[in-house]
């Protein structure tokens, strides 16, 4: 049985308890497909998909159906005709967590699994990177050293985008970010057309504030968690690996790191982590963890072995 000690809004599971909740949910993902979804340095395998992600997909599938019934009940109470009866209200999922914790892989795997369920085959994934202010604007605001912190995002534009999707607009456009250029791409748009499910992935998507925030529009949210020292090690390892991949491209904003020796690269990575990523995690990202519907806790080997579900 899941662990229930003191009265709490959460119920905690180890992996064995959680995997039992898969029931008969089929695995509709191949090893080749998983390789394409796996991020640099991530260790996720099909066993973890079966034991962690399939129960999660089943839970979300059940909640999507329940949410649609709730919307229908509210419309009935208000005496309103059901708008676009063949087009359900989009179900919005937020995925949050630190840099290098693996939230992008989690979001991609979840997208692939949810799109294989009947009744919600249109599943879009948008990252909040595109809503960062362009570098020129960050420079004008003296925020380049705060890139990734909440104030470096155009939160009004992000709110307008999610509101448009949630309200059933025929389409909504999200700006596009280039990790190669380390900047938004002028004029580039990710067009979302009335999805059944929208997954919004980003560092600060669970932020709260004195006014309506994007997290207030979520129907379900995930926080990918791990010990801070483990995330730091994953960040450093990824930084070292990227010298031979993304950094090696002459067009990369970080091309100058590609020629660093291991020792110098480790020093550079730890300096970036300790001056930018760790403070952002501690000050802004980690405090939002209690707001998540489900927390996925990773061990040092990247495996998910503990989960905490919000039941209230």
Curated annotation (Swiss-Prot):
Location(s), subcellular: Cytoplasm
Keywords associated with the record: ATP-binding, Coenzyme A biosynthesis, Cytoplasm, Kinase, Nucleotide-binding, Transferase
Keyword Magnesium tagged: no
GO cellular component, one term: cytoplasm
Domain of life: Bacteria
Principal place of residence: cytoplasm
Pathway assigned to this chain's UniProt record: Cofactor biosynthesis; coenzyme A biosynthesis; CoA from (R)-pantothenate: step 1/5
EC number: 2.7.1.33
Protein name (record): Pantothenate kinase
Taxonomy of the source species: Bacteria, Bacillati, Actinomycetota, Actinomycetes, Mycobacteriales
Record gene name: coaA
């Amino acid at each position: 049985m899941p662990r229930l000690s003191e009265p709490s809004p959460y119920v905690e599971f180890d992996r064995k308890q959680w995997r039992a909740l898969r029931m008969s949910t089929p695995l509709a993902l191949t090893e080749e497909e998983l390789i394409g979804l796996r991020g640099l340095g991530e260790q996720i395998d099909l066993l973890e998909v079966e034991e962690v992600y399939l129960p999660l997909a089943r839970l979300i599938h059940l909640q999507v159906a329940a949410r649609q019934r709730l919307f229908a009940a509210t419309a009935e109470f208000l005496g309103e005709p059901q708008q676009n009866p063949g087009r359900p209200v989009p179900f919005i999922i937020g995925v949050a967590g630190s840099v290098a914790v693996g939230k992008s892989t989690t979001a991609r795997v979840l997208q692939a699994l949810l799109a294989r369920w009947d009744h919600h085959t249109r599943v879009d994934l948008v990252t909040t990177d595109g809503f960062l202010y362009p570098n020129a604007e960050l420079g004008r605001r003296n925020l380049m050293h705060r890139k990734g912190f909440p104030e470096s995002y155009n939160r009004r534009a992000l709110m307008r985008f999610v509101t448009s999707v949630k309200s059933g607009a025929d389409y909504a456009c999200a700006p596009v970010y280039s990790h190669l250029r380390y900047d938004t791409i002028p004029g580039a748009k990710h067009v979302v057309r009335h999805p059944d499910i929208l997954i919004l992935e980003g560092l600060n998507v669970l932020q709260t504030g004195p006014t309506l925030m994007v997290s207030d529009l979520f129907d379900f949210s995930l926080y990918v968690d791990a010990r801070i020292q483990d995330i730091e090690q994953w960040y450093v390892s990824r930084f070292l690996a990227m010298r031979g991949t993304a950094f090696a491209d002459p067009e990369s904003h970080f091309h100058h790191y590609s020629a660093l020796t291991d020792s110098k690269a480790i020093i550079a990575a730890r300096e970036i982590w300790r001056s930018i990523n760790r403070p952002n995690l501690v000050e802004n990202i980690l405090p939002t963890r209690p707001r998540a519907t489900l927390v996925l806790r990773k061990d040092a080997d990247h495996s998910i072995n503990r989960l905490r579900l919000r039941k209230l």
